[in-house]
């Protein structure tokens, strides 16, 4: 379980949120919503331990995140707004970098992400959407329980969004957790996703 307890965050003397508390249990996924500058990416960075709140605490499995950082990161898949891949490597080589023990599974993961036939193409030669798919192919490889995804559908077509949404649904059905930001609808998942709306100084579930 991931828990945010009474989080407070300020940027440039502006309060993004105050008194923000919520939990994400096994089998749940949460969509963080809000306008530009509402603090969506900032919240995800706090939840992953990449930044510290100005007040409050994040807990993982009942322990303060700052005390269990190593075990937490072994349970976390974080894909930020930037794909975080190496453009000089091929799609296959990028996945091998993150998942060196899964060589036999890499082609299938890339195919699931819509990159069949592009396995050995240098990432620098791929489109923005294809580069995004290289990063998202990790969803078919990771064993992490918690997925935190910042705008995962950027530059992804409708069919790709549907396929990725099905993968997230399968992960939560198996007891995993997903937290994501997106401006796009989640096809077939509208009734199962919990929404956390950042409203500028507060939030609502």
Swiss-Prot record:
Classification via SUPFAM superfamilies: P-loop containing nucleoside triphosphate hydrolases (SSF52540)
Primary location recorded for the protein, binned into one broad class: membrane
Domain of life: Bacteria
UniProt record, GO biological process: cytochrome complex assembly
Compartments in which it is found: Cell inner membrane
InterPro entries (UniProt xref): AAA+_ATPase (IPR003593), ABC_transporter-like_ATP-bd (IPR003439), ABC_transporter-like_CS (IPR017871), ABC_transptr_haem_export_CcmA (IPR005895), P-loop_NTPase (IPR027417)
PROSITE patterns per UniProt: ABC_TRANSPORTER_1 (PS00211), ABC_TRANSPORTER_2 (PS50893), CCMA (PS51243)
Any one Gene Ontology cellular component term annotated for this protein: plasma membrane
Subunit structure: The complex is composed of two ATP-binding proteins (CcmA) and two transmembrane proteins (CcmB).
Family: Belongs to the ABC transporter superfamily. CcmA exporter (TC 3.A.1.107) family.
Protein name: Cytochrome c biogenesis ATP-binding export protein CcmA 2
Organism this protein belongs to: Salmonella typhimurium (strain LT2 / SGSC1412 / ATCC 700720)
Gene that encodes the chain: ccmA2
